[in-house]
Amino acid sequence: FMYRTHPQTLETLKLCKEYFKDTDVKILSSFGFDAPVDKSHRLRNLNLAGGAILDVGCYPLSMARLIAGTLNDQQYLDPISIEVKGSLDVTGVDNKSSANLVFSENISAYIETSINEELKNDLIIKSDKVEIIVPEPWHCGQFQDGNYSIELNFEGKKTIISNKDEVGLFTREINEASECILQGNYESSSMSHKDTLGNMLWLEKWYSENGVKYPQNIVEKSPIFSSQYEPVAKLVKSEIEGISKKGSRLVFGCDNQTSQLHASTMFDNFFNNGGNIFDTAYIYNLSLIHI
């Protein structure tokens, strides 16, 4: 996300660490717009991953996880629960949705997204005594000639922190990617691979609970199984005393699969490469792997 490398975001995180330690915190964030487009447009097309959540809902979700992580001295923090409300377009994509997220006993968030209504498109972090308001947290002053601001309300006093970015929102993102490539880094400290994966998984939970059913996620319709990839059974197998069938020396742990399609894809690949032993302890993934 381009906003991750911008000084407005970095200043916001600094203020969060300074003012919100050891207190109940509520995060409010939204990204939504009204897009009067045809049904075939990507925003309304299930086959093109349409819908508000995947298009721009990823921004407030990623920001909430970032702030929750910052308040816990981590790069990010995943929610422990999500409650979703929303509506579907006639095409089956979500056109508006909201989610209540709980990160811990003292950190929660309310996020919104839409493709049929203009939302506030802001970020608010607040407790009983402090409130931080970030206007345009995604564009970071991009459309105001680089001028950005953060409003801090503390003990009845309002402070406006303002500055101008002379580099540019997307230029900063490009510079970060270029620097990682030149230094041989496989990931950016601004958003790690684990952070990215976590955001993807919670986006899937969000749109799934909103009732969105992408064709690619339905096992029978998934393009994965029509792949031309031909695996080679190269995993070494050994004999186990008392068992007639040879077993692969590599065992597949069934503790991180998040859906039937996810599990089927990984299990199929493992089996086609010669694997045939699965560790399916009932305690894995809160027993969800058995549901």
Question: Model-found features: residue ranges?
Answer:
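Alpha-helical elements of Rossmann-like donor-binding domains used by nucleotide-donor carbohydrate transfer enzymes
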Residues: 7, 11-15, 26, 62-63, ...
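Short histidine/acidic/glycine/proline-rich micro-motifs that form metal-
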Residues: 2-6, 87-90, 256-258, 282-285
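Contiguous beta-strand/loop segments that form the cofactor/metal-binding neighborhood of enzyme cores
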Residues: 62-142, 175-184, 204-205, 220
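Predominantly a Rossmann-like dinucleotide-binding segment in NAD(P)-dependent oxidoreductases
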Residues: 3-78
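N-terminal binding-site loop/beta-alpha segment at the start of enzyme catalytic domains
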Residues: 220-288
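Calmodulin-binding IQ motif helices
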Residues: 291
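C-terminal glycine/acidic-rich active-site capping loop/insertion
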Residues: 126-194, 209, 214-216
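C-terminal helix-rich "cap/oligomerization" subdomain common to oxidoreductases
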Residues: 104, 179-236
